[in-house]
Amino acid sequence: MSKVNSEESSSSQKLLKEVEKISEALYVNKNPRGSVAGSNKTPTKPLSRSNLAEPKEKKSFWNWPLRAINHVRNRRFNCCFSAQVHSIEGLPPIFQDLSLTVHWKRRDESLSTRPAKVSNGRAEFKDKLTHTCSVYGSRSGPHHSAKYEAKHFLLYVSLVGSPEIDLGKHRMDLTKLLPLTLEELQDEKSSGKWSTTFQLSGKANGATLSMSFGYTVVGDTRNPASSGSTQNFRSSSNVKQTSNNTGLTRAISAKSSLGNGKSASRRYDHSIVNRESHPLSQNMEEIKDLHEILPAVQSDLGSSVNTLYQKFDEEKVDPANESQFEFDVVTKHIEPVESISHEKEDANALQSELVTGNETVVPFEEIKKAGEVPTAGSDEVGAENFPLEEPLVNGNETDVPFELLKKAGEVPTAGRDEVGTEILPPEEPLVNGNETDVPFEELMITGEASIARSEEAVEIVTEELAPEEGNKISPKNEESVVPKDAEEVMNGEKDLKEMIMKDLESALKSVEMLEATASEDEEDRKKHGDKDKYFITPMKETVPSCSRDVAESVACEFLDMLGIEHSPFGLSSESEPESPRERLLREFEMETLAAGSLFDFSIEGDDPQLECDENFPNEYESDFEEGFDLASLVHDIEEEYQLEAQARVSHPRAKMLEGLETESLMREWGMNENTFQNSPPHNGRDAFHPADFPVKEPFDLPPLGDGLGPVVQTKNGGFLRSMNPLLFRNSKAGGSLIMQVSTPVVVPAEMGSGIMEILQKLATAGIEKLSMQANKVMPLDDITGKTMEEVLWETSPTIDIGDRDHVSERESGDASGFVRGGERRTSFAAKPKKFGSSSGNNNFDSEYVSLEDLAPLAMDQIEALSLEGLRIQSGMSDEDAPSDITAQSIGDISAFQGKSGCVGLEGAAGLQLLDIKDDGDDDDDGLMGLSLTLDEWMKLDSGDIGDEDEINERTSKILAAHHANPLNFIRKGSKGEKRKGKKGRKCGLLGNTFTVALMVQLRDPLRNYEPVGAPMLSLIQVERLFVPPKPKIYSTVSELKKTDEEEEADASDAKKEEKPMEEQGIPQYKITEVHLTGMKSETDKKPWGITTQQQQVQSGSRWLMANGMGKGNNKLPLMKPKLGSAKPGDKLWSVSGSGSKWKELGKMGKSNTHIRNPNVIMPK
C-alpha cells in the first residue's frame, strides 16, 4: 500500500512540475495571438517544451484585439456560402480525355471538386462546395445601406496530374451577393443564388466555366463581443486522390472554453481530409477562424491556455498512427444511426466529463486528448510518454494551477474529440473517490455519468442537461456515455432505431422511383470508380455489418442526391437573361412565388442542412434517436410535384403569349389570317414559289412604315418600294430589302434595239462618263439615315405643285418644252400608287397596258432580277457569263452620217446630229443625255414640238436620236392645221418600239436604309400596238387642255375625223423584255457613285452572307481564283428576264427565270 502511495505521490509531483514549467512557458510568450497568426511557417515535427517559449514572427498591427474592438458596433451574421460547379465548355482539343478539378479557396482553406473527364471540349461537374463563416455588417453605406466586411475567395481550375499549368485565376467577394439592407438579410432575403460564367485563360483560352453561387444566413448576433452562443463552422479540407482513401474520415481537435465561462467549439464535419496536409496548419487556421467568431477581449492567461491546447493539438502522433486512429475509432466504433445523428448533434462543450459516483476525473486528461487519444499500442500523449497503467492525479494536489484558472475566469472544460470515439483501456484505473475532495462543480459541467467499458462499441445517447447555479453554458443537447446498468433502455432504443431505418429504406425506394436522374448518378459513379472516393458532399461511415451496409449505402445515395440534384437549378447553369426561356421564367416569377422572393425560389427545393454541410446552430439540430422525421423527404417530393404542376399550368399561358406575338408580327408585316389559307405544305426548298399563289388573288406588299403603303415617292420623282417577301423565304436571318427606283426615261433609239447593242453603246462612253450620265439623267436621292416619314414630308410639296412644275418647265425651257436631265420634274411622278405589286391588281392581267403602267408592271420582274444582280456584283452567283465582248468605239464618226434622207425632217428639223463623242464640253452628255421622260416622249410623239422656226439644235438632236418620222407624216405644215393634226392623230411621230430605262438601288431597312450593293440600270423594251376602241380602263395619254378655238375647229371637222379615229384605235403598250445591267470595276474607280470597288463588294456581300442567300458559293469574291481566260478591265454584266412570260414560267415550276448575258468589256 505504501508503495502505491509513493508511486502516486511521485506521479503527482511530476505533474506539478510539469504544470509549473507550462505556466512559465506561457507567461514568457507575451503575444500568443501573434504566434498563432504566424503559424504558416511552423515546422511539421512535434513541438518540444524547449521551443514553446520561442517568440513567433509576424506581429501584425491589425491584431485580433483591435479587430474585436472594430466589430463591436457591427452586426454579425453566420453565412453559409455555396459554389455549385456546373460545367466547363469550349475546351481545346488538347484537353480531350484529361481530368480537370475546380478549386475554391478562402485563405488556407481550399475546397475542390471531383475530377471531371473532358469529352468533346466539355467537362461536367455535379459538385457543390460550401464555406461557412461570420460576416460583419453595418449601416455605414450610402443612405444607411448595408456595408459588409469583404470575404475574398479565389477560384481556379487545375489539370489533374499537372497542377502547375495555369488556366486562369479569378478573385471574388461573395458579400456582393448580400442584400442592400441588414433587415432584408435577416428577413425575406436570408438566402440567395447567383449564376455566372468565368473565362479561362492559358492553354484553356476560350473555355467557359459555369457556376452558381449562393448564400444562406444560418444565424446572426447583435453584439458579437458578448455573444455566448455556439457557432459551428466547416473545417478546412483538401481533396486529394489516394488509392487508400476509400472512406470518409473526420478530423477532430479540442478547443478550450473562451470568455465568461461560456464554451465555444469548432466542429469538423465529415469531409475528405488530405493526408499530406499538416495538422499544425489546420489547427492554426481553426484558431484564426475562432477569433473571427468570438473576438472577445481575453486575459493573457486565458489566451495562453488556449494556445497551450493548440500546441498540444500540433503534437500529434505520426500520420500512420493518426490514420490508424481515425479508421479504428471512427469506422469501427460508430453505428450508422449514430453517424447520422452526429451530423445534427450539439457542439457546445469541447469534451464531456467522465465521472463515476462522486469521483471526478481530473481535467488534465485533456492534455491526452489534445494530442489525439492513443490507440492500443500508442504510448505518446502530448510531449510526454505516460504509461497506460499510470493512475490519474489526485484533485487535492492540483489545486494551485486550477485556482489560477478559476481566478482568471477561464474554465478549461474537457473538450470532446468525437462522440463515441474515446476508447479507454480496461487496465486504466479511475480516480479514487476518497482522494477527490476538491469542489470542481463551479469549474466543470454539472452532471453525473459513468464509463461503460465495452469491447465492441460505445453506445451513445443524448440527454438534456438542465442549467444549474454557477453553470454559464446554455442548456443544449449534450452527449455523454451511458452507464452500463442502462443497457435495457439502450436495447429498446436500438429496436427503435432499426424500425426507423426500415421506414427510411422503404421511403428511399419510393423516392428513387420518382428520380429520373438516379441512373445518371450510377453511371457517373462507375466512370469515376468508387462512389465514396471523391464525394464532396458529406457522407457517413459504415460498419462491417451487411444489413447496415445496405441501409447506410441507400441513405448516402439519397442524401447525396438531395444535396446535388434535388435543387430546381442543380442540373442547369441558368440560361442567359436574353434567352426566351429566361424571359418567360421571369414573367411567371411573381405568380410562382406569391409568398417568397426570387432568392427564396432559387434554393426552395434544396435541403438547407445539406447545402451548408449541416453547419447549423444548435437550435436547428435535433437527435436522430428522438425520431427521424420523414417530413423533410415528403416536403421535397411535394415541392418537386408542385414545380411540375406549375409547368403544366404555365404551358397554356406560354402558348397564349406565343399566339399574341405571332399576331403582332403578322400585323407588322401586313399579313392577316387569310394569308396562308392557300399555302401548300412546306416539303422542299421551292415549296413556296410565286406560281403556287393564284395569279388573280390580291397580294399586298408589306408597308414601308406605320400608316404608310408599300410605295413612297422621293423628292426627285423616284420611288421607294417594298419587295415581295417570297423573294426572301430562304433568308436565314430573316432579312429583307426595299427597292429604290428613279424616274423612268426613254433612251434614244439610236442606242440600239437589242440588249447587247445597247450595252455596247453604253460601254463606249467609259465607266466614269457612263456613271456621270446615268446619275444626271436618272438621279437617286440619298435617303441613308432618314425615316420614311421624313422622306414623305420632303416629297409632299413636290407632289402638290407637280402640275405647276410641269407648266413652268415648258415656259422656262426651250421653245419645244423639253428640259434637260436632272432639271426636270414630271407630273408622271405624282402617282406612287401605280408602283405597287402587279400581282394584286387585276388591271395588269392583260399584256397590254398604258404607258404610265409600264414601269409598275416591270417592278415584279426587276426586283427578282435585282437579287441576282446583287450576287453577280458580289461574285456569289452560281452562273458565269457565257463570254466576254469588247465594245467597239465609235470614234469621231457622226452617229447619223448618211441618214438624213431617212429622217425626213424639214428645215431645222432636218439638221443632222452633231458628233456625240465627248469633246470636253460639260453640256454635251452624249446619247444618254438625249433621253426623254415619259411625258416628254408622249408630247414629242404627238407632234407637240412648236413651229418649225422654233425648233433649235437640241430638239433636232433629240428627234434624230429617237428616229422620229417626218413632220408631214402627222400634219400639213401650215400653222392653222397644226392643232388639228394633233387632234386628228394623237401619236405616230416616234416609232412603235422603244426602251425605257431606270436606275435601281437596293437598301436595307434594318440598317438605316443604307445602300446594299451598287446601283443597277434596268432596261425595259416596249412595243406599241393600236387596238380597237373599247371602254377606257386607264388614262392612256396626257391631254393638253382644250381652248374655245380648238373646240370650234373640232366641231367643224368632227364628221371627217370620226372614221379615221375608229380605224386608228387606242395605243397600248406591251413589255417584251426586261434587262438589268451593272458595272463591275476592276480598278479603283467610282461606278454608279460608289466610292470604291471594295465598298461595292462589301455592301452587297455582307448582306448576302449574313442572310445565307449567297447560294452555293461560300467564298468571298476577293478570295475566288481568277480564271485564266477572263479578260481584264471594267465590265458591264447583264441578266435578262422574260417579259410577259414571267408568270407562265413560274407556273411551270422554274424558279430560275433569268438568263445571263455575255459581259461587255469597256475600252480603257
Swiss-Prot record:
Short name of one Pfam family: PMI1_PMIR1-2_C
Q: Indicate the segments forming the C2 NT-type domain, all copies.
A: 69-217
Q: What are the cysteine partners in each disulfide bond?
A: none
Q: From its record, what is one biological process in GO terms?
A: actin filament-based movement
Subcellular locations according to the entry: Cytoplasm
Q: Which keywords describe this protein according to UniProt?
A: Coiled coil, Cytoplasm
Can the keyword Cytoplasm be found in this entry's annotation? yes
The entry summarizes the disruption phenotype as follows: Severe defects in both chloroplast and nuclear photorelocation movements resulting from the impaired regulation of chloroplast-actin filaments.
- The segment annotated Disordered runs over 30-54, 224-268, 466-486, 1038-1063, 1124-1164
Compositional bias of kind Polar residues: 37-51, 224-263
Cellular component per GO, a single term: cytoplasm
Q: Where is the composition biased (Basic and acidic residues)?
A: 469-486, 1052-1062
State its role. Together with PMI1, necessary for chloroplast and nuclear photorelocation movements via the regulation of chloroplast-actin (cp-actin) filaments in pavement cells.
Q: Which PANTHER family match?
A: PROTEIN PLASTID MOVEMENT IMPAIRED 1-RELATED 1
Q: What is this protein called?
A: Protein PLASTID MOVEMENT IMPAIRED 1-RELATED 1
State the taxonomy lineage: Eukaryota, Viridiplantae, Streptophyta, Embryophyta, Tracheophyta
Name of the gene this protein is made from = PMIR1
